[in-house]
A protein has these predicted regions:
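Non-catalytic positions within long, well-ordered alpha-helices that form the structural scaffold/packing
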Residues: 98-102, 200, 219
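Metabolite-binding pocket within alpha/beta catalytic cores that recognizes anionic/polar moieties
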Residues: 1-154
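Polyanion-binding loop/helix "lid" in catalytic or ligand-binding cores
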Residues: 147-158, 184, 196, 252-264
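Zn-dependent metallopeptidase/amidohydrolase metal-coordination segment
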Residues: 209-247
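His/Asp/Glu-rich mid-to-C-terminal helical/loop segments that flank catalytic regions of hydrolases
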Residues: 236-273
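Active-site/ligand-binding-proximal alpha/beta "capping" segment
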Residues: 163, 169-205, 270-271
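Short acidic/polar active-site loop segments enriched in Thr and Asp
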Residues: 104, 205, 224
Length: 273
């Protein structure tokens, strides 16, 4: 715990008195949200002790602090993935730092493959729940009691009030936002068609390689969470073509204007209490 406290002190110092209320983690191809932050403070991950840096395509590896939608935000332009070789604890390190500097709200986004055949590329999906079957867990090992209990409840990971608010934001723009279950795979390989069929049978609507470790850590320390998925491709076996990281980035870029607008408006309407 002392390592977290020490790193949080450095982050607080770099923020020069600025006190964010909301942590925003950006997914593949969605980093352009950072360009809309007012009075930005840029902090490279490498400036924070014990903080790892992102190596994934489309992830810059820095914090941006400032105003977005009238709220004080700390934005992660580039997230960490376990497939990059980081441990689960290293992946959630920034979430715990955010908690220690006083943040108790998180908007987490990702690019994912659509499993639900009704979904279309470019649509947004509110994450209502997740499925995680692999054994990688950021809470494994000795519990850090200062963050939360040994056995945290996961029956309501994603905040229903936040979901309703984001849905109303999209409705005002006449955009239909989907809702569904996110299946977490570690990656970096894409899933096989057989795996996708199994996931669909289990009730999953989208699949991706991020988000779940951070959400587990955030709920462990009592954060309220809004999870947003951008469907950037259809999962393996649905369309007769191979999957690539480039199409994920392209779909993210194509949807970025709508995405930025919706998140900014959500922040404008979001109560801070």
């Amino acid at each position: 715990y002392s390592d977290y406290v020490e790193s949080a002190a450095v982050l607080r110092e770099k923020l020069s008195g600025f006190k964010p209320d909301v942590l925003i983690i950006l997914g593949s191809g969605l980093g352009s949200l950072g360009e809309n932050v007012q009075n930005p403070i840029f902090i490279d991950y490498g400036e924070i002790p014990r903080m790892r840096t992102s190596t994934a395509i489309g992830h810059k590896g820095r914090f941006i602090a400032g105003l977005l939608g009238g709220k004080r935000v700390l934005l992660m332009q580039g997230r960490l993935h376990i497939y990059e070789g980081w441990s689960a604890e290293e992946v959630v390190f920034p979430v715990r730092l955010a908690k220690l500097i006083g943040i108790d709200k998180m908007i987490i986004t990702n690019a994912a493959g659509g499993i639900n055949r009704d979904f279309k590329v470019g649509e947004l999906m509110l994450i209502s729940d997740f499925i995680k079957f692999n054994c990688v867990n950021p809470l494994a090992g000795r519990n850090i009691d200062e963050f939360g209990p040994r056995f945290p409840d996961m029956s309501r990971v994603f905040d229903r009030d936040y979901m309703d608010l984001f849905r109303s934001v999209c409705a005002d723009s006449r955009e239909n936002v989907r809702e569904g279950v996110y299946f977490y795979c570690m990656g970096p390989n894409y899933e096989t068609p057989a795996e996708i069929r199994a996931m669909r049978t289990l009730g999953a609507d989208a699949v991706g390689m991020s988000t779940v470790p951070e959400c587990i850590a955030a709920r462990h320390c009592g954060m309220r969470i809004l999870g947003i998925t951008l469907i950037t491709n259809m999962a393996a076996g649905i369309l007769d073509k191979p999957l690539s990281g480039e199409e994920v980035i392209e779909a993210g870029n194509a949807a970025s204007k709508r995405f930025v607008s919706h998140v900014a408006e959500f922040l404008r309407r979001m109560p801070l209490d």
